[in-house]
Amino acid sequence: MRVAVTGAGGRLGTALVKRLTDEPFADEVLAWDLPDHDLDDPRSAGRLVFAARPDVVIHAAAWTDVNGCAERPDVAMRRNGTAVGEMAEACVRIGAGLVMVSTNEVFDGRRTDGLPYRPTDPTGAPNPYGAAKLAGELAARLAYGASGDDFAAAATSAGSGTGAVGRPATPPLAIVRTAWLFGLPGADFPQKILAAARAARQSGTTMRIVSDEIGCPTYATDLAAAIVALVRESGRAGGRGFDGIHHVVNTGRASRAEWAREVLRLAAIDVPTEDVPMATWSRPSNPPGWGVLEPTPLPDGSLRTWQSALAEYFELLPKEP
């Protein structure tokens, strides 16, 4: 199987390429990134897809600067919405499957019943980043003829995403929603907390951490493994092995404050902290206050807890001098 990964130099893309190169089923791994794959170029997707003719494309490329998206919503829609549709249309034309990576920010976060969001729950993005990613989901579904409710429920009802959804004329499509991604490369939430904690310790100040934003910290390495497992299964069930909307996150939930305190515990940094509400933290983009996703069944089983994943990740980080 020939598998292409967009955004191959990013946090998730790096983990995907690394994982795929160790998989026997992936005969060839195509790592696509700038300048060859450019989300701002309408012809970029077709040019690559038609030339390489992959069996599956994992579309991990995105503009994930949520504040930048809020300040430039037109650019966000171009990169995270329109570009997804262009990739999906190119893949359909050559009969390639597509895995589109999406976000928990397609939900408005106003849920008050304490239940996690399921793939079949109504969406309502609270910010331009989420709106653009949701537009990308819809564009991909339109290209693949997967606009019905049965597609949204396929991953949940089939046990591991192995159920056909009544559209045999097109290849398989998976939308993988995730949340709060951390891992190398790049500065992620744990690294930002470490930097802020060291600065607070040096200056003798208190760290202020948001306590009413709840989500699912997810390790890029674990997310990549789950996506690769879905691709591995894609040849089963008559070619519909990964159809549907999948929620893929590490097990468990946390507030930003709880996540930060676990980071500080692992780093053995003792600084005073203060919980503050989101309303006091000024930023261009408003995240969903409740962004917890209910994981859908996966071929290799549920992901480990976010605490376990974070502990492993810490072994890879440079130690404080």
Predicted feature descriptions by range:
Residues 3-19:
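N-terminal Rossmann NAD(P)H-binding glycine-rich loop of SDR-like oxidoreductase domains
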Residues 30-41:
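Rossmann-fold cofactor-recognition segment
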Residues 39-81:
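NAD(P)H-binding glycine-rich loop region in Rossmannoid oxidoreductase-like domains
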Residues 71-99:
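NAD(P)-cofactor binding segment of oxidoreductase domains
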Residues 78, 82-86, 108-155, 162-176, ...:
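Catalytic helix-loop patch of NAD(P)-dependent Rossmann-fold dehydrogenases
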Residues 141-155, 159, 163-215, 221-222, ...:
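NAD(P)-dependent short-chain dehydrogenase/reductase
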Residues 226, 233-282, 314-315, 321:
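Mid/C-terminal beta-alpha module of Rossmann-like enzyme folds, strongest
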Residues 269-271, 286-321:
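C-terminal amphipathic/interface module of NAD(P)-dependent oxidoreductases
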